[in-house]
């Protein structure tokens, strides 16, 4: 951190100012976060022990669920605890740590969604060569690449923010640490830093979104050569992917691809993609996937009847 900084602690304004509303939010968001951890954790457990789900598609799905848990846990626990606190504080080092892991897991999730789209493309457009192309080694490399991409992205974000001097005030108009609200507290011009963040976050999201849209267009065009049953199964899988893409990329593009003025709308949108969306993803994937639902039923059946094989 720059030597001119004398701010060591930051204060969040929070999502709402009314204590009664904050109490209601606590009652709502605590079960949502617990459902996120349990739902995504159940997918990870089911895929890891179910032989019927031993395919690249479900391997990627379990990795995505693991990232969802990590991504939501970066923000949600402190946010929920702060709903009951009169003064919501975080150290400057804790703020930077939160920014790092928030962007790390966020970009890792984006890249995993792109990987899953590629897997879907190969499965539908090149089914005869699927096992040769999507090998176990490639699966591990793609997942490792997603995590590495998230790490590199976060390092850039931290290098941008760590050079800024913070002389006061120390109140962040948000309920968690992110770059744009923190820029408002810097006692120097942050135009260039804002441009770097726009290029690193916003344009990255848009570029990834365009890749995803292009891949789904190619998939839909190729579905004309499939049977009615094959089209139905492929469309069901694609519908789940597309729904997750819209839920994740919509808010991200809204936040990072427009000038910042006030953060009232930003905070409401941020709640959606930091708390709500991670809970919805396992529901979206399991409700439209018969194999996952059957595997989960078998898992529970074994727990209830441990003597049965």
UniProtKB/Swiss-Prot annotation:
Residues 48-55, 119-137, 218-233, 288-309 are cytoplasmic. InterPro entries: GPCR_Rhodpsn, GPCR_Rhodpsn_7TM, Olfact_rcpt, Olfactory_Receptors. Disulfide bonds join 95-187. Pfam families: 7tm_4. Belongs to the G-protein coupled receptor 1 family. Odorant receptor. This is Olfactory receptor 4B1. It comes from Homo sapiens (Human).
């Amino acid at each position: 951190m720059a030597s001119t900084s004398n701010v060591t602690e930051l204060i969040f304004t929070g999502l709402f100012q009314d204590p009664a509303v904050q109490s209601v939010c606590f009652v709502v968001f605590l079960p949502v976060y617990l459902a996120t951890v349990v739902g995504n954790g159940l997918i990870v457990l089911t895929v890891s022990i179910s032989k019927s789900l031993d395919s690249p598609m479900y391997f990627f799905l379990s990795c995505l669920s693991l990232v969802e848990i990590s991504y939501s846990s970066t923000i949600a626990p402190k946010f929920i605890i702060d709903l009951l606190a009169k003064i919501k504080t975080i150290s400057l080092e804790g703020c930077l740590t939160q920014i790092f892991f928030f962007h790390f897991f966020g970009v890792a999730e984006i890249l995993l969604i792109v990987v899953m789209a590629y897997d879907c493309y190969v499965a539908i457009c090149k089914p005869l060569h699927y096992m040769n192309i999507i090998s176990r080694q490639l699966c591990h490399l793609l997942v490792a690449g997603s995590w590495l991409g998230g790490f590199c992205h976060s390092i850039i974000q931290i290098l941008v923010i760590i050079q800024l001097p913070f002389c006061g005030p120390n109140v962040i108009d948000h309920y968690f640490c992110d770059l744009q609200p923190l820029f408002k507290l810097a006692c120097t011009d942050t135009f260039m830093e804002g441009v770097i963040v726009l290029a690193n976050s916003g344009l990255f999201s848009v570029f990834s979104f365009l890749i995803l849209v292009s891949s789904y267009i190619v998939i839909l065009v190729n579905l004309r050569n499939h049977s009615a049953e094959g089209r139905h199964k492929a469309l069901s899988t694609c519908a789940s992917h597309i729904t997750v893409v819209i839920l994740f990329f919509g808010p991200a593009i809204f936040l990072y691809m427009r000038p910042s003025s006030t953060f009232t709308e930003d905070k409401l949108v941020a709640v959606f993609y930091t708390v709500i969306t991670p809970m919805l993803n396992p529901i979206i994937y399991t409700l439209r996937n018969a194999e996952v639902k059957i595997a989960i039923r078998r898992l529970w059946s074994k727990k209830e009847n441990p003597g049965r094989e």
